[in-house]
Amino acid sequence: MEFDPERFIKVCDKLRKYIVPHKTNLNKMRIGNKSDGGYVICEGLPEYDALYSYGSDDQITFEKEFYNKYNKQSYVYDHTVDSITNKPDYLHFFKEGVSNHKTHNMDTVDNHVMRNGHINCKNLFAQIDIEGSEWKILNSNFKTIENFSQIVIEFHLPLDALQIIRAESMFDNVFTFMNERFVCTHIHANNSPIQPWLDTNFPRIFEVTYVRKDLVTTREIEDKPYPIDGLDFACAPGRADLELDYWIEK
């Protein structure tokens, strides 16, 4: 396949339409670092059952703040580190990654939920930052997706523009799957040095907050640009945060 600039722009246009932040009946707050590892989430949801954290990398400020606020256990999965330094008792660490099928060092979210006795829970929280593997798990094989009331995910688009074009159907499947079940309530662009490079006002790496649809009583498309002062913070301190406003009618 040869690179087609027009098709590349078309795929980027679709991404902007798939990921549109909404104002809802739920207030927002930040949990975690005031840099990479912190996320903007929604308040006012039913009491959480537990936190599932994928891709912690021995950095658990999010899990600590989650426990301090909600007093809930964390189930942390990361096959790239051997342990969590000064691990608190409320945090259960597993040296195991997450994928769309079981391997020697990976397993599915469904199996994790089942193994931990949460199969009947409807208010789990997930934090997912797995460096591109998110595309593998967000599909119809993810049977317990609606056991989660809120999910924050860092998405990683391919580095190469031609790979973006080749991934069009994957983007279609993933974001259709998510938007059928959840409302996008926030997006924040990661300001790492390798972006932005999509010349369509869309970042290559971005964090999205999703709330399950049945928990959102009112919503309308956000009318303000991001980042939000006091909530959003640059992932890479010392570099300017990236401004997003593509959802606002010009």
Task: Report residues per predicted region.
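Switch II (G3) loop of P-loop NTPases
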Residues: 126-133
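Short, polar loop motifs at secondary-structure junctions
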Residues: 58-59, 76-84
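Conserved acidic residues
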Residues: 96-99, 129
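A short alpha/beta connector and helix-capping loop motif
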Residues: 134-173
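Short loop/helix-cap segments at secondary-structure boundaries that form the rim of catalytic
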Residues: 65-68, 82-91, 143-146
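Conserved SAM-binding loop of SAM-dependent methyltransferases across substrates and taxa
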Residues: 57-70
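Rossmann-like AdoMet/SAM-dependent catalytic core
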Residues: 1-50, 59, 95, 105-122, ...
